[in-house]
Amino acid sequence: MSSMNPEYDYLFKLLLIGDSGVGKSCLLLRFADDTYTESYISTIGVDFKIRTIELDGKTIKLQIWDTAGQERFRTITSSYYRGAHGIIVVYDVTDQGSFNNVKQWLQEIDRYASENVNKLLVGNKCDLTTKKVVDYTTAKEFADSLGIPFLETSAKNATNVEQSFMTMAAEIKKRMGPGATAGGAEKSNVKIQSTPVKQSGGGCC
């Protein structure tokens, strides 16, 4: 085997975006490490994890970037939209405001990401059924009107977390077609480590 061949057939760069506290980091932890913590600390700037999956007999390396949802980091994260193959917009099903802000996040995607980037809408914390305020049908109809897939997830119970990332990978692979080369993602020398900062308030479910 030639040493030029990478260990994967595709490399997809994915972004997790959405308001602070909706559970983006918990979704990433569940998918990449299969762990969950009630008292997760706020992501500062950008952090990423890598997981390799198998899909239709192909090996796909997912580089998943977890971006801070705080307003003050909007300018930092704008550069991370570039080169992304897929973007997962996350809201909290117990927080109407986070769902209302999805439109704003979609505007960010239109402004900064490549035109044909794949999108996925995720309503997290679906295990909190008694606190749920965003109806599944409402969110599904909204996603359908935009032509993007929608799933409700629970990072706590691992509900649909795997499915969300696999759906995104399958959509990107379908769009790129059989002629796509391994890699695809832009090479970047920027390395930003997230620094733990204690966050007052509840966990991220």
UniProtKB/Swiss-Prot annotation:
Key word Lipid metabolism present: no
Residues carrying lipid (S-geranylgeranyl cysteine): C204, C205
Motif Switch 1: where in chain: 34-48
Keyword terms, alphabetized: Acetylation, Autophagy, Cytoplasm, Endoplasmic reticulum, Endosome, ER-Golgi transport, Golgi apparatus, GTP-binding, Hydrolase, Isopeptide bond, Lipoprotein, Magnesium, Membrane, Metal-binding, Nucleotide-binding, Phosphoprotein, Prenylation, Protein transport, Transport, Ubl conjugation
Binding positions (GTP): S20, G21, G23, K24, S25, C26, E38, T43, G69, N124, K125, D127, A155, K156
Record-linked Pfam families: Ras (PF00071)
EC number(s) recorded for this UniProt protein: 3.6.5.2
Disordered: annotated segments: 178-205
Cellular localization per UniProt: Golgi apparatus; Endoplasmic reticulum; Early endosome; Cytoplasm, Cytosol
Positions occupied by motif Switch 2: 66-83
Keyword set includes Magnesium: yes
Modified-residue entries (N-acetylserine), positions: S2
Positions of modified residues (Phosphoserine): S194
Entry comment on modification after translation: Phosphorylated by CDK1 kinase during mitosis.
Top-level taxon of the source organism: Eukaryota
Glycyl lysine isopeptide (Lys-Gly) (interchain with G-Cter in ubiquitin), cross-linked positions: K49, K61
Catalytic activity: GTP + H2O = GDP + phosphate + H(+)
Gene Ontology MF terms: G protein activity; GTP binding; GTPase activity
Any one GO BP annotation for this protein: endoplasmic reticulum to Golgi vesicle-mediated transport
Protein family according to the UniProt entry: Belongs to the small GTPase superfamily. Rab family.
Domain-related comment: Switch 1, switch 2 and the interswitch regions are characteristic of Rab GTPases and mediate the interactions with Rab downstream effectors. The switch regions undergo conformational changes upon nucleotide binding which drive interaction with specific sets of effector proteins, with most effectors only binding to GTP-bound Rab.
NCBIfam families for this protein: small_GTP (TIGR00231)
Role summary: The small GTPases Rab are key regulators of intracellular membrane trafficking, from the formation of transport vesicles to their fusion with membranes. Rabs cycle between an inactive GDP-bound form and an active GTP-bound form that is able to recruit to membranes different sets of downstream effectors directly responsible for vesicle formation, movement, tethering and fusion. RAB1A regulates vesicular protein transport from the endoplasmic reticulum (ER) to the Golgi compartment and on to the cell surface, and plays a role in IL-8 and growth hormone secretion.
Protein name as annotated: Ras-related protein Rab-1A
Naturally occurring in which organism (per UniProt): Sus scrofa
Lineage of producing organism: Eukaryota, Metazoa, Chordata, Craniata, Vertebrata
Gene transcribed to yield this protein: RAB1A
